[in-house]
From Swiss-Prot:
It is an enzyme of class 3 (hydrolase). The keyword Zinc does not apply. The gene is mre11. Its cofactor is Mn(2+). GO terms for molecular function: endonuclease activity; exonuclease activity; metal ion binding. This is DNA double-strand break repair protein Mre11. The active site is at H84 (proton donor). It comes from the Archaea. Belongs to the MRE11/RAD32 family. Its EC number is 3.1.-.-. SUPFAM superfamilies: Metallo-dependent phosphatases. Mn(2+) 1 binds at D7, H9, D48, H206. Binds 2 manganese ions per subunit. Mn(2+) 2 binds at D48, N83, H176, H204.
């Protein structure tokens, strides 16, 4: 049995809030807990292990600790690079990606680790062929890995894929992104032009997907707001793929309130709160107090203030009552049309505005 995880983005920080970095480490800890429960033979990591161009010692240390924990429980680790994995070093060669650097630094089978990484260069007698053979000998399964590539190298990758497909059968293909350079995040755009693989595993797309032999695994936590409320977890692949869900380590809460009818917002010091607040100019102090209170009760708070009305509406003598209502009341127009009859005998537009301001206090 193998497990497929991807897009850990270790060290990711949301909105420059340093404390949010812990979300990535907590997510990996949850994955570790599940992996130790299910005890796969191998864990495949589909790239974007790290998040930033320059990877810190702490981030590398966290990943090495992960390898050690897996190895102590007789679980091997196989990884490729994603587009986030050491872009500072990733120039023209896959060999400069972080997983390969770890391998060359001694985190490899020759030094007692069950950790294997692929650059994605399948020349004769290349390290990738040797790595493939080592995994076959140890685990009786063929894993073919390709690290992140740029679109100018697509012809080279297709050539390697055709070589692999001629020489291997029933193998697991491990890649970071789709082969369509213009649609790298659309699983429907994957076009492998090969036949003999058992499963093709992809990361990068930040979604859960399984159709036919194509599997995409999501990140273990929400990297951004748009990923909130999407499934987090990883795949276990034995006789058939099974998805293992985990709780999101970076909870986002998005909601809207009206200061005229405020509601209680339950505190969560681990969560990121995105809040639309509808207010009037007379409620500025109330809005500021809300900001202060919420920032003490959430890890990070972003408030989008939405002014319900302006204090001074410029009207023309020529404007009729209905036009004034539309201008002043905006989205409340339909409701306040019920007041229209109250203004039947008032001719002056400014007087109408004064009445509206009175009703809005």
């Amino acid at each position: 049995m193998i497990a497929f995880i991807s897009d850990l983005h270790l060290g990711n920080i949301y909105a420059n809030k340093k404390e949010t970095e812990e979300h990535s480490y907590n997510a990996l800890a949850k994955i570790e807990e599940k992996l130790l429960e299910y005890q796969p033979d191998l864990v495949l990591v589909g790239g974007d292990i790290f998040d930033k161009n320059k990877v810190s010692g702490k981030e590398i240390g966290v990943f090495i600790d992960f390898i050690n924990k897996m190895n102590k429980n007789n679980i091997g680790v196989v990884s490729i690079s994603g587009n986030h994995d050491g872009k500072y070093w990733l120039k023209e060669s896959f060999d400069h990606a972080i997983p390969y650097i770890l391998y060359k630094s001694g985190i490899n089978p020759e030094n007692g680790y069950e950790y294997y990484s692929f650059a994605g260069i399948y020349l004769k007698n290349s390290r990738d062929w040797k790595t493939l053979s080592m995994i076959e000998d140890k685990y009786d399964i063929s894993i073919v890995g390709f690290s992140f590539y740029t679109k100018d190298r697509l012809p080279e990758l297709y050539e390697y894929l055709s070589i692999i497909d001629r020489e291997k059968s029933d193998y697991i293909l491990l890649m970071h992104q789709s082969l369509k350079s213009l649609l790298p995040q659309d699983p429907a755009a994957i076009d492998l032009t090969i036949e003999n693989y058992k499963y093709a595993l992809f990361g990068h797309m930040h979604m859960k997907y399984y159709k036919d032999k194509i599997i995409v695994t999501p990140p273990p936590y929400s990297i951004s707001l748009k990923e909130a409320n999407t499934e987090k977890g990883f795949w276990l692949i034995d006789k058939k793929p099974v998805f293992v869900p985990i709780e999101d380590s970076r909870p986002f809460i998005k909601m809207a309130i009206d200061l005229d009818n405020p509601i209680e917002i339950k505190p969560n010091k681990n969560a990121i709160l995105i809040l639309d607040v509808y207010y009037r100019e007379s409620q500025i102090d109330k809005l500021n107090l809300l900001k202060k209170t919420l920032s003490e009760n959430f890890l990070y708070v972003k408030i989008n203030p939405i002014l319900k009305e302006t204090s001074k509406i410029i009207v023309k003598k020529s404007e009729n009552k209905e036009e004034i209502f539309k201008k002043y009341l905006k989205e409340d127009y339909d409701f306040f049309m019920e007041l229209y009859e109250k203004f039947r005998d008032i001719k002056d537009p400014e007087t109408i505005v004064q009445y509206l301001e009175f009703f809005y206090r």
